């Protein structure tokens, strides 16, 4: 006997209907003062000159204007469109796709707690909950002093060091709720701890300029080489004289 059809299931696609326009924040600049515009044009010229096709410079240009206001503003989006000969819709489509481009003002330090599967199981959820309680903010919110913006983030490809906390995209490995609390306290007291690896921390706006491809003035000496989990596979391969298979057609 054929069963009667069930009730239809409606699936909502896209953002919730009550979500505000992603790039319209009260007080956000819609144009740059002449001196700021001139400075950004110099930087943009250097960035665009690296690409044979101007529109290929869109991603670094978005980082450039993000470094001006700590998030993407109507002024920044318009600047990118004007520099590259794109429409506002084309720029906004790219900017809204990538989560590294911020849609609201960001603190001096963007603290991201990985809550993807492995980090969550290893303590990432507990770390995020502890920081929410300690800082008095939720996901994508900024402390009242403007120093820390907290967010949960997806995998940072550092699962062998789980749970991982990122500060302005620098790694802090093998964190605990207590060490993460000490980390954000060091940021708010202007005595930031050194990342587990990589360059010393700098502010979010300067980080955005570095991601745009502009000079990085931080010391280039590493703060610790690869850890044991990263090297384990290489050590096993060497011990067993394991070699990568030859590339097909390499001898032809």
Swiss-Prot record:
Organism's domain of life?
Answer: Bacteria
Residues with PTM N-acetylthreonine: 2
Q: Which Gene3D superfamilies match?
A: Glutaredoxin, NADH-quinone oxidoreductase subunit E
List the residue ranges of the region (Disordered).
211-252
Q: State the UniProt keywords alphabetically.
A: 2Fe-2S, Acetylation, Iron, Iron-sulfur, Isopeptide bond, Metal-binding, NAD, Quinone, Translocase, Ubl conjugation
Q: Which GO terms describe its biological process?
A: respiratory electron transport chain
Q: What are this entry's molecular-function GO terms? A: 2 iron, 2 sulfur cluster binding; metal ion binding; oxidoreductase activity; quinone binding
- Catalytic activity annotation: a quinone + NADH + 5 H(+)(in) = a quinol + NAD(+) + 4 H(+)(out)
Its EC number(s): 7.1.1.-
Q: What does this protein do?
A: NDH-1 shuttles electrons from NADH, via FMN and iron-sulfur (Fe-S) centers, to quinones in the respiratory chain. The immediate electron acceptor for the enzyme in this species is believed to be menaquinone. Couples the redox reaction to proton translocation (for every two electrons transferred, four hydrogen ions are translocated across the cytoplasmic membrane), and thus conserves the redox energy in a proton gradient.
The name this protein goes by in its record: NADH-quinone oxidoreductase subunit E
Could you tell me which species this protein originates from? Mycobacterium tuberculosis (strain ATCC 25618 / H37Rv)
Q: What is the lineage of its organism?
A: Bacteria, Bacillati, Actinomycetota, Actinomycetes, Mycobacteriales
């Amino acid at each position: 006997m054929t069963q009667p059809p069930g009730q239809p299931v409606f699936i909502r696609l896209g953002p919730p209907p009550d979500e505000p326009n992603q790039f319209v924040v009260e007080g956000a600049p819609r144009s740059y003062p002449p001196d700021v515009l001139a400075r950004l044009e110099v930087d943009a010229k250097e960035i665009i000159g690296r690409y044979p096709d101007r529109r290929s410079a869109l991603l670094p240009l978005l980082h450039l204007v993000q470094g001006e206001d700590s998030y993407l503003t109507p002024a920044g989006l318009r600047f990118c469109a004007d520099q590259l000969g794109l429409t506002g819709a084309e720029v906004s489509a790219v900017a809204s796709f990538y989560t590294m481009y911020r849609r609201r003002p960001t603190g001096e330090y963007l603290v991201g707690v990985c809550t993807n599967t492995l980090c969550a199981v290893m303590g990432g959820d507990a770390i995020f909950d502890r920081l929410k309680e300690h800082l008095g903010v939720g996901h994508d919110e900024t402390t009242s002093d403007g120093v820390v913006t907290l967010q949960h983030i997806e995998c940072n490809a550092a699962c062998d060091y789980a749970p991982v906390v990122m500060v302005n995209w620098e790694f802090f490995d093998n964190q605990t709720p207590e060490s993460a609390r000490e980390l954000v306290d060091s940021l708010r007291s202007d005595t930031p701890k050194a990342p587990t690896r990589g360059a010393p921390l700098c502010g979010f706006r300067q980080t955005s300029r570095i991601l745009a491809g502009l000079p990085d003035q931080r010391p280039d000496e590493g703060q610790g080489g690869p850890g044991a989990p990263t090297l384990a596979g290489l050590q096993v391969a060497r011990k067993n004289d394991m070699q990568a298979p030859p590339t097909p057609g390499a001898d032809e």
